[in-house]
Design a protein with these regions (language model features):
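Anionic group-transfer/hydrolysis microenvironments
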Residues: 60, 76
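Nucleic-acid endonuclease domains
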Residues: 1-55, 65-68, 77-210
C-alpha cells in the first residue's frame, strides 16, 4: 500500500498540501481503503455499498444470494501521543453512536440498512505519527510534489470485529459514541482483548447504556 499522499491535485496543476488535522486524515484512510475493499468484493462476487456522511457503516458488504446477511466495515484512525519521557500513551478509538441504531427500537436510525440485517461488524483501525511540518495547508506547484511530505508516518493498522475491541465507557468528550478499549499496544486491538465475549453481550450492554 502506498501511504505517501501529499496533497490534492486541481485541474490547474496546483497541489493543496495535506495538514495533519485528524478529520482530514480519517477521510484519507477511508479513500485509501476503498479500492482494496472494492477489489476484494469484486473477486468474491460480493455487493459493496457506501454509506452517506454521518451514516453507519462506511461500507456494507453482502452476497446477492444472502442479502439479509450483511457485513459492516468502518474505518477508524488516531495518532500517537507520548508523555514527557517519550513513552507512548494509551490510545483508543470511537466506534460509532450507541444512541442511534443500537438503542432505536426498529434499529433503523442512522444506519444504511436495519441493524438486524448485519451479522458482522468489522473495524479497520489505523494509528500514525503526525508530521509536525504539516500543521497547515499550503498551495504548491505540481512540479514540487515529489518534495512534499505526507502529513503522517509510521502507519500501523489492525482489522478486528467491533465487539472484540469495544470498551465499557463512551468515547472521550461530550459524545454518544461507543469507546474502544485503551492500550498503548496495538496487538491488544489486533487480538481483540476487549471485555465482551460475544457480539450479543456487547449489544445488550450498549443498547442499555445511559
Amino acid at each position: 500500500m502506498d501511504w505517501d499522499l501529499v496533497g490534492i491535485l486541481t485541474r490547474s496543476s496546483k497541489v493543496y498540501t495535506l495538514s495533519y488535522d485528524s478529520k482530514i486524515l480519517s477521510g484519507i484512510f477511508e479513500i485509501l481503503c476503498e479500492p482494496i475493499i472494492r477489489t476484494i468484493c469484486e473477486n468474491k462476487n460480493w455487493e459493496l455499498e457506501k454509506g452517506v456522511q454521518n451514516q453507519y457503516p462506511e461500507f456494507t458488504i453482502y452476497s446477492k444470494k444472502s442479502p439479509n446477511k450483511k457485513i459492516a466495515v468502518d474505518i477508524k484512525s488516531t495518532y500517537r501521543q507520548r508523555n514527557v519521557n517519550g513513552e507512548l500513551k494509551s490510545f483508543a478509538f470511537t466506534l460509532g453512536s450507541y444512541r442511534s441504531y443500537l438503542q432505536d427500537v426498529k434499529g433503523e436510525k442512522g444506519i444504511l440498512y436495519p441493524y438486524k440485517q448485519y451479522i458482522e461488524h468489522w473495524i479497520i483501525g489505523f494509528i500514525y505519527d503526525r508530521n509536525p511540518n504539516c500543521r497547515i495547508t499550503d498551495i504548491k506547484a505540481i512540479i514540487d510534489a515529489s518534495r512534499l511530505e505526507p502529513p503522517y508516518s509510521n502507519i500501523e493498522y489492525f482489522i478486528q470485529q467491533k465487539y472484540k475491541i469495544a470498551g465499557t465507557s463512551k468515547g472521550s468528550g461530550n459524545t454518544t459514541n461507543i469507546g474502544s478499549i485503551k492500550s498503548n499496544d496495538l496487538n491488544d486491538f489486533r487480538t481483540g482483548k476487549g471485555p465482551f465475549n460475544t457480539k450479543e453481550e456487547f449489544e445488550l450492554y450498549w443498547k442499555n447504556y445511559k
